[in-house]
Amino acid sequence: MRIATIRRKKPESFAILSSPGPWPQVLINWLATLAVIIVFGLIMLFSASYTTGYLRMGDSFYYIKSQVFCLGLGLAVMLLFSRIDHRFLRRMVGPGYVVCIVMLIAVLFSAPLNGCRRWLRIGFTIQVSEIAKFEMILLTAHLAAKAPHLEKLDPASGRRVPAGQWLYQRIVRELIVPLLPLIPVVILLMLEPHMSGIVLTTAICGTILLLGGSGGIITWAGGTSAVLLLRTVLEHIDSIPYLQSRLDGWTHDLSKMTDQTLQSLYAIGSGGVTGLGLGNSIEKQLWLPESTNDFIFSVVCEELGFVGAVIVILLFVLFLVQGLWLAFHAENRYCTLVGIGIMAQIAWQVFCNIAVVTNTLPNTGISLPFFSSGGTSLILLLAEMGVMINIGRGGERARLERENLRALREQREKEKSNNTIWLDPNVGY
């Protein structure tokens, strides 16, 4: 009697660093758009910071030198991540999540700055929430891609699965499980407190599930849960002084508006259609707090006017459209979800930053990608851009492999048809 043996499937082997594949034209155009945004951002940062740098640091080039240095480091990191195999990143999401949680806990024991604990000081400062956003993109994409597709018919019995059971399993596997790791991150960010980090991280993870192929029922369940959570927060906002002060400055009239928001609106109004000219901002002369960071878009509006603001927005829109094209043409579902998450981070940060600057949303302290000063943010953004390069080249390689396979099949079918002997039934053999 022959006994069948079950062999375990060996884990797929791969090199950590590999050549992803050829460069598609869309990826080249996307990189060109990224380069324009980065150069534009450096010009505006220097214009917004040279007065502040001289008055605060004694060096007009202080902020721009720091940004250029971090840009150099970020480009090196981008090159590294563009060569890292996405399967290695997927395997490291578990250890990366543990490290991220440990760092978020360590931040709570650091010295507060402006009433918040957001920076970890280890010889230099690291904003751990930026690392958390990157980690949650990778982890949420991994869990969402891993969720099995549930059929309404039981494959074993062939019977129809009860609607309630099917819906419950879908909500658990496609919504609750991918978002479960977000809960500890949100709690730790709330203890800092860092409301903008909570909003962005939650919005990014939600966008991954929304655009990643979750059904309408799952989207409805997630949206309903988010609305109920927001309602609960607003009902108990009096017990959170940090949020109450931000909301009061947003809902009341100009007399109670925060100085940052008020000066930001002055800057936008002063710019008019064409602006005061590059370098001619008045509000950046220490009138507008955080002119080099969260409110740099106000300086753009003041110096370049409505035209300059529209150009910045259109550049980001073009960048996002090209990036989403790369994501949706990736080689597998995991890469697609990671690409969606990275583009969602850029989109939400741009939207929230402009909304805060124009007083459409309360002041939450969200930077403008590639424009605002901040080493941790810039380096991690460029690391994510490296992942996008890997995704774009991997998708092009997969496309060429499919085309070659299709051509090979067509060639074999053609050879097979040419080698077939056709017999005429009217002719005797």
Whereabouts are the PLM-identified features?
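Hydrophobic residues within the alpha-helical transmembrane core of Major Facilitator Superfamily
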Residues: 105, 133, 206-207, 347
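Hydrophobic alpha-helical segments of polytopic membrane proteins
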Residues: 94-95, 100-101, 175-191, 195-235
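Membrane-helix boundary/helix-loop-helix interface segments in multi-pass membrane proteins
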Residues: 2-32, 36-37, 43-192, 354-369, ...
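Interfacial segments of multi-pass membrane proteins
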Residues: 199, 203-218, 282-308, 365-379
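Hydrophobic, glycine- and aromatic-enriched re-entrant/interface helices and adjoining loop segments
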Residues: 113-119, 218-312, 331-338
